[in-house]
Amino acid sequence: MQFTSLEICAGAGGQALGLERAGFSHVALIEIEPSACQTLRLNRPDWNVIEGDVRLFQGEGYDGIDLLAGGVPCPPFSKAGKQLGKDDERDLFPEAIRLAKETDPKAIMLENVRGLLDPKFENYRNHITEQFAKLGYLGQWKLLYAADYGVSQLRPRVLFVALKNEYTNFFKWPEPNSEQPKTVGELLFDLMSENNWQGAHNWRLKAAQIAPTLVAVQKNTAVLTWDLHDPNAHGRSWVWMVQVCGIVRRLKTFTGMPRLTVRMTARIQGFPDDWQFFGKKTPMYRQIGNAFPPPVAEAVGRQIIKALKKEN
């Protein structure tokens, strides 16, 4: 049985890849960033990638899909920004509601940052839930941690899953994996030691924990950094910064803290090594930093399919 999905704000394909692994076939993926669109086409030439503003996309012709998914922009709700919420012009939740009305999917899955669960956005969350309820969906909000699903990174993300009433009772959130994910040291040791860098073993010991959260930052400074400014970080000492530069040339006697390459950051985000990224280094790092870890999308996607099959 084939399950179809339409994805908005597809980015570099983290969510799309996870949903594909779960069993969804994408009828279309809408993304406004040219380099991210090229990344999608590079990895899946057969995907119907539509480059453009989702606000100009019309859902007619895609009615009857099984899933409407997307990672709508996070700046309106991110603590790194002004948290303007619904007053931010980048808020695309209204577009997701519009497309749900136009395409009438059986299920909806939208992803955003943890900040959306802040008390200041409670009324807006209720508004979103109510708007989908008017279309015949019962929605749930849930905070998930990527580390619970095999990713070597905490990365808390908010998921909104809504299903048509006939499927609602069959949906259950995915259970965390029983095994702990690899530490960053274990995950990246082969890449760190591939040039016979003598400090690789010591680096592995220092990196013997999972990562906090990879964050996309503005160009010309750092593009990815460890988000250790959170008051709950307890002053962890291993603050690493990834700068926009070439792939690190680690001399055998190098003793400093090496920068993380594009491939390393992608692996931390849960992408497979054969997933390629298009563009210069700044766009590539940004694509990775903004991505939804594929293993998390896969875990939720599998549960949605079970609900659509009425298996749970």
From Swiss-Prot:
- Its domain of life reads Bacteria
**Could you tell me which residue ranges the SAM-dependent MTase C5-type domain spans?**
3-311
Active-site residues annotated for this sequence = C74
Does the UniProt entry include the keyword Transmembrane? no
**Would the keyword Methyltransferase turn up in this protein's UniProt record?**
yes
Q: So what EC number does this one have?
A: 2.1.1.37
What InterPro entries does this protein map onto? C5-Methyltransferase, C5_DNA_meth_AS, C5_MeTfrase, C5_meth_CS, SAM-dependent_MTases_sf
Per UniProt, the keywords (alphabetical) are:
DNA-binding, Methyltransferase, Restriction system, S-adenosyl-L-methionine, Transferase
Quote the protein name from its UniProt record: Type II methyltransferase M.NgoMIV
Q: What is the lineage of its organism?
A: Bacteria, Pseudomonadati, Pseudomonadota, Betaproteobacteria, Neisseriales
